[in-house]
Amino acid sequence: MSSNMQAMKQMRPALVSLTQQQARRRCFKLYRNCIRSIPHLIQHYNLSYNMSEMRNRFRSNFVEFEEVTEKNQLDRLAFIGETELFDAMSLLKTRSHVVNYFDTQPVNAKTISESEKLLNNFFE
């Protein structure tokens, strides 16, 4: 059985985690499923990205939320990620949806221009 089908079979409906560790395990499982689904996404959506670019994009999204520790927030993020991945793997999304996801760069920190720094210092 291919890893794509294996990744599809491991997706489950959203459940409420009993503990924080269980919620974190769900997030790690989602990350593994995202990485396993990359060849399927490239093939079916005819993407021009290589695997390392897509892997880095998935990783940046997970790193963005690594400081979330509350069980309910982890469950919510895992549910959103699972449904998005399920829609993409089930070909419910169009190619433009998937391309837009990989084209947009994650916002890390707001860059402050010199004029904004001056105004911030002035009003402090």
Swiss-Prot record:
Entry's family note: Belongs to the complex I LYR family.
Disulfide bonds: none
Membrane topology listed for this record: Peripheral membrane protein
Swiss-Prot/TrEMBL keywords: Electron transport, Membrane, Mitochondrion, Mitochondrion inner membrane, Respiratory chain, Transport
GO cellular component: mitochondrial inner membrane; mitochondrial membrane; mitochondrion; respiratory chain complex I
Main location: mitochondrion
Organism domain of life: Eukaryota
Protein's organism: Dictyostelium discoideum (Social amoeba)
InterPro entries to which the protein is assigned, alphabetical: NADH_Ub_cplx-1_asu_su-6
UniProt subcellular location: Mitochondrion inner membrane
Role of this protein: Accessory subunit of the mitochondrial membrane respiratory chain NADH dehydrogenase (Complex I), that is believed to be not involved in catalysis. Complex I functions in the transfer of electrons from NADH to the respiratory chain. The immediate electron acceptor for the enzyme is believed to be ubiquinone.
Name of this protein: NADH dehydrogenase [ubiquinone] 1 alpha subcomplex subunit 6
